[in-house]
């Protein structure tokens, strides 16, 4: 095809491009390429079209093809460049710079403007890719092209500026040529700026300087540029700062550098480089403090400057700030490491490591040696530097490696003999090894070479300080060296510290010593020894302000857990000045520093003690004692604090520990005496007199031991007098005190003293104390002691001369006390008491003394009370009442004023008397209050007509008066043992509380007191009470003897001895005494009682008719007694005479009020119903009475007892009744808990059903409360057996298998001690328990043990048929396990069962034997026999059990598919009878299973669902019902009901049904 045709097609392509029809373009170009494969334009057009159609790869290929065809043609390269710019593709971007380079080459000669554009694009592209060097070179080509065009300098400036910007990143990493290019750009740009000075010019200059500062080889140019900029901008900080840093790094300290630093600080006083520079200058000028200060401030601004950090470390070393120097060295090392490229970095690191090593070596911590050695290892060429070797030797020496240090020292001295450091190291070695003479020589050699070295002088002085005895006495040499060291190095704190030692210990100049210590501490505030010495001397010199200032300055700067010495001393200072809270705070801070310092804990304890924090003080001293067990002081303080807190027994133990450790320690002996004295006073306040006497005896013993060691101590004699005097309250017969002979002036070890002798000893002790020092308190104590002595004498004799003399002495002593200290109200009060006492009778003086006491102290309850008592003694009731009233207002808890008001109320006959006396007993125990309250309680109790009044219920019942009065009287009689009326009242109250033995003892004391007084009339009355109480406790012979001691003429005497004869079994003598009493009886009531007693005697003699006649005689009296009618009812019941019992009950009901004798009436009525066979009526009667009297616990207990015996089906209600009885009255709990447990056992309340309410738990409580009741142990045995059976049925582990024999032994031991119970009861209980134990052993498989126990029981009780039955059961079980039971054996078993004709369970057992042999008819006969027997006995449970067993027997036969229609009928009949008695799920289940076996589908589902969905059904019965119901529903394919059943099973946790359903589903 011709060239024209190609051109035509290309023309069409161009038209298509103009029309933007790029597909057409491709079509036309392809047509061209078919004609001409290497057509340049066609490939370019294809590239363009593909680019527009977003086909970049095709476009690139087309352009590349065009470039290959004609590489120097622009069109294709332009297209390729446009494509790469347009499309953001990685390979395109990478190739774009090459395209730009080609375009630059093509445009260079053709189009300058296009060249500039492409050059800018290429530079920008390099900059975007962070290729700054190529970008700069490209940009430099553009600048050259512009320069060739001779453009103006202001037009060139932006170009050069951009050039500097491109190369300013990572200047130090640029090659030399590029660096030169950068510097040339700066130098070319700066002249191009027209306006100078200007901000633009300044910024460019700064940029230039910044770049130069990064080029170490351009330091000269940097210095020149900075100087030029300073010339142009003299007030600008930046060039000065850079120039200063240049001087600092180069170590330049010339005038020029210092001038720079000064100018910089003039412009900015806080400028970092300026401060650093001046700091370096100060360091060279040896102004180390200023250098350290300036360098520290400067480095806060310029952190990364290794040379400055080295200078700072050097300055800090010079002023001995080792910790700060270590930080500075580390900073220098880090900075030099970061600037590793710098030529001086190695030198700086070596210097920093050396300084660090020196700081570690010279520091106080011995743990720094290893770190110092590591630092020295980092120094380059260290082994060739002798000075560094010397430092290494010191480090080894500090580490304790003396051999290594010695080797280094020797090498240094051999190789560098002129070196002072080697000799110094040798001197240190000798000094540490205490070779002081050798050390002196070496140190002097070192000083010869370096005489201005303060450290050498210090160690030489230290060597002299510890050298020989001569130098120890004469410290002149040492102090000379310390003075030189201090002069050469005024920052060496240890030199000043030892100068302080010299002035303090040798020169005796404490003021100058304090100055030296203070200077040492100021130089090194970590030197606690210097600070502590400065503070201690300041306090010693009385300069507390200076001491406090030092301590405060330390504590304010101290971190937590540091500066213990300062906190401790400041804490002690505050403790001394009474600022206890601050003291506690500071001592806590001291303990944070050292928690194991026992002294600190003791100081803290003292601080707490000073501010009244006894508990915290106690803890502190206990901690101190724990840390230092040998400290006597800590234990003593613990004991004394416990004594203060009132825990005297614990304090006694602590004091005893002190005595065990240190022997006879007087403070501990005194403390023991005080504690025992306080224990005695506490016991006296509680009326525990014998305990008080023991405590007083111990107090006297310990105080006497203390006096033996220190007889000069007044406090010991005073305490001993107090101990002897406080025994005044104890009765004479109770006081028998052993006293050391030293107190009595003889050589005997101990001597027994009675009460008057002990009181007299107390008086002598007060006299001895007065001889040591005469004080008012001692005179008063002596007077009180004399008063108590006189009162004791008057208590046993009438007023004697001795008593009068003692009273007179008492008054004179107290008057002496008043004269010495007339403002003491207690002395006036004591004077008043003595003056108005019996034997003195000076009431006027007493009144005056009491009033004076009140004037001395207005809030004086004792004086007001005594004044009231004085007025009451004189019969002035109104004034007495007013005085007591004031006393009550002053202290409402003061019991004596309340007693006074009670006595006034009693005198005037007020109804508040009893309330007042009761209030006194509630406040505290006092003899007057106790006896007064007991008197009013007994008086109220004796009035039997007021028992139903509200006043009685409040005063006696609600206020628990009998118990309160009994307790008060018990304490009263413990102290006052000769008051027969008190003992009479106590006996009366004991009888009310049913404390029979205690009542007997009280009446015996009354008899003994009256016999001593020979009061016949009162003695006869007391003998009556005593005889009655003896009879009550079962001492009948003693009671007969007691009554025989009376004239036996009064009614009470005769009835008392008659009762004693009856209880003794002497019926004839009893009848005789009762008949004699009948002759003296005055009222019909008394006669009725005697006739009733005679009837009881006749009944015991077997004369029933005579007894009945006597009781009938009682009933015809005008006022028949209730007791006689009750006895007549009981006689009718005993003889099973319903008519007699009913008639007597009707007569009884006529004479008994509704609220009286509720329990007895209910008991008799219910017994009659039971006798008539009306058991439910008996239950209803008990329920009716409970409904009428719900608060009567006896009725609830009776109902609980009645239910299991006569209506066992209501056992759950019986259990509730027993629980209520127990809750209402604890006195009935002994029986009520047992009744409740028996009911629970009868109701089947097991542990598995309820963990709280079950028979086992209830019986365990009963056994815990009443272990003496054998019935409880027998019932507990039954409960355990029931639990074992339930565990066996539920396939659970059994934990109570081996307890039956233990319980049996308990029953036997408890019944042996029961005398008041009929023998028949104990025999029955034992037999029942034996049977239960034998059954338990049999069930557990312990057959041989069961057989042996049964055989033994038969031998002991051959008439007990149950044992024979049990033996046959055991033998039968053995036979069944071995062979078939023969016919003769069955006959023998039947005979045994017939011998137990009252036991339906025996027939049950025989039926089971027949069943095991397949003899179903015989088994049926046995069940019918048991059913008949249970029906005859009215045994509801037995009847129910027999019917269910009969039904189960019938079901077994039916399930065996035996063709006999009688058995299904028998099952239906038996279960129907059961359901007539009660709703029984088991009976319904048996009917349902029968229907299931006979395929009665509808009836089966109804019956089984009735059991499954019935609430309250047992788990076992419900499971069996679900099992059969699931099989039935599955057979009927009733999926809906099956799902309902499965949900029910899941709700009740019946997993077995779920498993059965799976098996049935899989099998179908």
Swiss-Prot record:
Keywords: Repeat, TPR repeat. GO terms for cellular component: cytoplasm; euchromatin; nucleus; Ski complex. TPR repeats lie at residues 6-39, 40-73, 75-110, 116-149, 237-271, 306-339, 420-453, 456-492, 493-527, 564-597, 598-631, 633-665, 678-713, 743-776, 861-894, 980-1013, 1020-1050, 1051-1084, 1400-1433. SMART domains: TPR. InterPro entries: Ski3/TTC37 (IPR039226), TPR-like_helical_dom_sf (IPR011990), TPR_rpt (IPR019734). It comes from the Eukaryota. PROSITE patterns: TPR (PS50005), TPR_REGION (PS50293). The keyword Transmembrane does not apply. This is Tetratricopeptide repeat protein 37.
């Amino acid at each position: 095809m011709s060239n024209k045709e190609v051109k035509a097609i290309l023309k069409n392509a161009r038209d298509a491009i103009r029309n933007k029809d790029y597909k057409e373009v491709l079509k036309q170009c392809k047509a061209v390429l078919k004609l001409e494969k290497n057509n340049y334009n066609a490939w370019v057009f294809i590239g363009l079209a593909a680019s527009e159609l977003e086909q970049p790869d095709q476009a690139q290929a087309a352009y590349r093809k065009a470039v290959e065809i004609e590489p120097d043609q622009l069109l294709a390269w332009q297209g390729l460049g446009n494509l790469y710019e347009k499309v953001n593709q990685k390979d395109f971007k990478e190739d774009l710079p090459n395209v730009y380079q080609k375009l630059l080459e093509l445009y260079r000669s053709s189009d300058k403007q296009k060249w500039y554009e492409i050059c800018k694009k290429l530079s920008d592209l390099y900059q975007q890719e962070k290729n700054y060097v190529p970008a700069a070179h490209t940009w430099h080509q553009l600048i050259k092209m512009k320069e060739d065009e001779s453009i103006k300098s202001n037009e060139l400036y932006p170009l050069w500026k951009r050039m500097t910007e491109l190369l300013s990143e990572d200047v130090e990493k640029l090659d030399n040529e590029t660096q030169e290019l950068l510097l040339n750009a700066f130098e070319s740009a700066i002249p191009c700026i027209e306006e100078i000075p200007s901000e633009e010019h300044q910024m460019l200059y700064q940029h230039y300087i910044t770049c130069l500062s990064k080029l170490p080889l351009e330091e000269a140019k940097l210095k020149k540029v900075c100087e030029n900029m300073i010339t142009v901008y003299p007030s600008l900080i930046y060039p000065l700062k850079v120039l200063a840093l240049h001087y600092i790094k180069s170590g330049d300290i010339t005038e020029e550098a210092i001038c720079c630093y000064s100018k910089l600080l003039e412009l900015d006083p806080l400028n970092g480089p300026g401060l650093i520079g001046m700091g370096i200058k100060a360091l060279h000028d040896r102004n180390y403090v200023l250098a350290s200060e300036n360098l520290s401030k400067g480095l806060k601004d310029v952190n990364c400057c290794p040379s400055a950090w080295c200078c700072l470390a050097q300055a800090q070393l010079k002023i001995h700030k080792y910790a700060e120097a270590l930080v500075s060295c580390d900073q220098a090392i880090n900075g030099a490491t970061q600037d590793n490229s710098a030529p001086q970095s190695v030198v700086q690191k070596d210097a920093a490591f050396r300084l660090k090593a020196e700081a570690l070596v010279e520091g106080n911590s011995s743990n720094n040696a290893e770190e110092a050695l590591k630092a020295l290892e980092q120094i380059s060429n260290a082994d060739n530097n002798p000075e560094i070797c010397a430092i290494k030797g010191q480090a080894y020496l500090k580490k304790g490696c003396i051999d290594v240090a010695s080797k280094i020292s020797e090498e240094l001295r051999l190789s560098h003999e002129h070196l002072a450091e080697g000799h110094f190291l040798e001197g240190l070695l000798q000094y540490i090894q205490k070779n002081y003479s050798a050390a002196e020589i070496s140190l002097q050699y070192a000083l010869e070479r370096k005489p201005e070295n303060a450290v050498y002088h210090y160690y030489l002085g230290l060597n002299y300080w510890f050298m020989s005895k001569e130098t120890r006495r004469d410290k002149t040499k040492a102090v000379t060296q310390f003075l030189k060291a201090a002069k050469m190095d005024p920052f060496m704190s240890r030199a000043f510290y030892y100068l302080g030692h010299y002035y303090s210990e040798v020169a005796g100049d404490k003021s100058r010593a304090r100055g030296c210590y203070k200077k040492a501490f100021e130089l090194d505030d970590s030197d606690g020894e210097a600070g502590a010495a400065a503070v201690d001397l300041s306090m010693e010199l009385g300069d507390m302000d200076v001491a406090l200032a030092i301590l405060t300055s330390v504590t304010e700067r101290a971190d937590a857990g540091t500066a213990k010495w300062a906190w401790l001393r400041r804490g002690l200072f505050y403790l001394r000045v009474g600022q206890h809270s601050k003291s506690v705070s500071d001592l806590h801070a001291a303990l944070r520093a050292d928690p194991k310092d026992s002294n600190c804990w003791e100081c803290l304890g003292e601080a707490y003690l000073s501010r009244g924090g006894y508990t915290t003080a106690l803890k502190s001293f206990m901690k101190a004692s724990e840390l230092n067990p040998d400290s006597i002081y800590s234990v003593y303080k613990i004991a004394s604090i416990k004594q203060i807190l009132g825990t005297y027994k614990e304090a006694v133990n602590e004091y005893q520990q002190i005595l065990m450790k240190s022997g006879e320690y007087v403070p501990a002996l005194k403390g023991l005496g005080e504690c025992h004295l306080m224990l005695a006073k506490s016991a006296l306040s509680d009326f525990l007199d014998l305990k008080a006497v023991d405590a007083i005896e111990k107090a006297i013993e310990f105080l006497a031991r203390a006096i033996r060691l220190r007889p000069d101590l007044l406090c010991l004699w005073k305490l001993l007098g107090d101990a002897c005097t406080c025994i005044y309250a104890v009765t004479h017969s109770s006081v028998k005190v052993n006293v050391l002979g030293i107190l009595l002036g003889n050589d005997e070890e101990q001597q027994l003293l009675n009460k008057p002798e002990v009181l007299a000893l107390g008086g002598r002790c007060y006299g001895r104390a007065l001889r040591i020092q005469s004080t008012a308190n001692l005179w008063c104590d002596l007077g009180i002691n004399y008063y108590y002595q006189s009162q004791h004498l008057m208590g046993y004799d009438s007023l004697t001369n001795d008593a009068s003399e003692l009273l007179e002495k008492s008054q004179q002593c107290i008057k002496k006390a008043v004269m010495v200290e007339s403002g003491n109200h207690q002395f006036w009060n004591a004077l008043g008491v003595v003056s108005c006492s019996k034997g003195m009778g000076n009431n006027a003086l007493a009144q005056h003394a009491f009033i004076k006491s009140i004037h001395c102290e207005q809030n004086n309850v004792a004086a007001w009370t005594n004044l009231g008592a004085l007025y009451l003694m004189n019969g002035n009731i109104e004034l007495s009442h007013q005085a007591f009233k004031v006393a009550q207002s002053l202290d409402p808890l003061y019991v004596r004023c309340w007693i006074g008001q009670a006595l006034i109320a009693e005198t005037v006959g007020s109804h508040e008397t009893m309330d007042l006396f009761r209030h006194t007993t509630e406040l505290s125990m006092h003899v007057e209050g106790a006896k007064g309250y007991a008197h009013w309680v007994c008086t109220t109790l004796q009035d039997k007509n007021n028992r139903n009044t509200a006043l009685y219920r409040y005063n006696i019942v609600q206020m628990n008066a009998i118990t309160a009065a009994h307790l008060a009287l018990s304490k009263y009689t413990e102290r006052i043992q000769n008051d027969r009326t008190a003992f009479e009242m106590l006996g009366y109250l004991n009888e009310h509380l049913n404390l029979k033995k205690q009542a007997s003892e009280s009446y015996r004391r009354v008899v003994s007191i009256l016999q001593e007084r020979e009061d016949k009339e009162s003695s006869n009355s007391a003998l009556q009470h005593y005889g009655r109480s003896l009879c009550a406790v079962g001492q009948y012979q003693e009671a007969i003897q007691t009554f025989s001691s009376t004239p036996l003429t009064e009614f009470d005497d005769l009835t008392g001895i008659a009762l004693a004869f009856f209880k003794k079994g002497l019926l004839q003598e009893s009848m005789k005494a009762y008949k004699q009493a009948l002759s003296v009886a005055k009222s019909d009531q008394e006669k009725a009682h005697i006739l009733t007693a005679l009837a009881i005697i006749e009944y015991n003699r077997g004369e029933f008719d005579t007894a009945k006649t006597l009781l009938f005689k009682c009933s015809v009296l005008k006022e028949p007694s209730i007791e006689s009618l009750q006895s007549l009812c009981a006689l009718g019941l005993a003889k099973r005479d319903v008519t007699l019992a009913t008639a007597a009950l009707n007569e009884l009901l006529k004479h008994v009020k509704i609220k009286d004798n509720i329990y007895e009436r209910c008991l008799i009525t219910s017994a009659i119903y039971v006798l008539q066979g009306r058991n439910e009526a008996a239950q209803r009667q008990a329920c009716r009475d409970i409904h009428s009297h719900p608060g009567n616990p006896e009725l609830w207990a009776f109902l609980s007892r009645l239910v299991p015996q006569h209506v066992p089906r209501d056992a759950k209600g019986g259990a509730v009744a027993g629980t209520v009885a127990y809750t209402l009255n604890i006195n009935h709990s002994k029986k009520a808990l047992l009744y409740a447990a028996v009911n629970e056992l009868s109701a089947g309340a097991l542990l598995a059903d309820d963990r709280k309410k079950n028979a086992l738990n209830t019986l365990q409580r009963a056994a815990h409360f009443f272990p003496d009741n054998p019935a409880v142990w027998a019932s507990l045995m039954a409960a355990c057996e029931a639990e074992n059976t339930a565990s066996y049925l539920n396939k659970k582990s059994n934990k109570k298998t081996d307890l039956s024999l233990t319980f049996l032994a308990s029953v036997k031991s408890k019944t042996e001690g029961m005398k008041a119970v009929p023998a028949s009861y104990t025999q029955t209980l034992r037999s029942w328990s034996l049977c239960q134990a034998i059954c338990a052993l049999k069930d557990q498989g312990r057959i041989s043990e069961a057989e042996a126990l049964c055989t033994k029981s038969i031998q002991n009780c051959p008439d007990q048929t149950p044992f024979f039955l049990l033996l046959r059961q055991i033998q039968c079980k053995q036979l069944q396990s071995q062979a078939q039971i023969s016919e003769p054996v069955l006959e023998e078993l039947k005979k045994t069962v017939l011998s137990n004709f009252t036991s339906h369970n025996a027939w049950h057992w025989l039926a089971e034997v027949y069943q095991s042999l397949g003899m179903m008819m015989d088994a049926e006969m046995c069940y019918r026999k048991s059913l008949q027997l249970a029906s005859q006995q009215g045994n509801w449970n037995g009847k129910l059990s027999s019917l269910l067993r009969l039904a189960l027997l019938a079901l077994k036969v039916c399930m065996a598919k035996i063709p006999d229609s009688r058995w299904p009928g028998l099952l239906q009949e038996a279960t129907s009878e059961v359901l007539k008695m009660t709703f029984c799920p088991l009976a319904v289940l048996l009917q349902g299973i029968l229907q299931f076996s006979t395929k009665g589908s509808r009836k089966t589902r109804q019956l089984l669902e009735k059991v499954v969905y019935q609430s309250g059904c047992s788990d076992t019965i419900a499971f069996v019902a679900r099992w059969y119901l699931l099989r039935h529903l599955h057979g009927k394919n009733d999926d809906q009901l099956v799902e309902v059943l499965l949900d029910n099973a899941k709700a009740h946790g019946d997993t077995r049904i779920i498993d059965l359903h799976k098996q049935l589903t899989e099998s179908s």
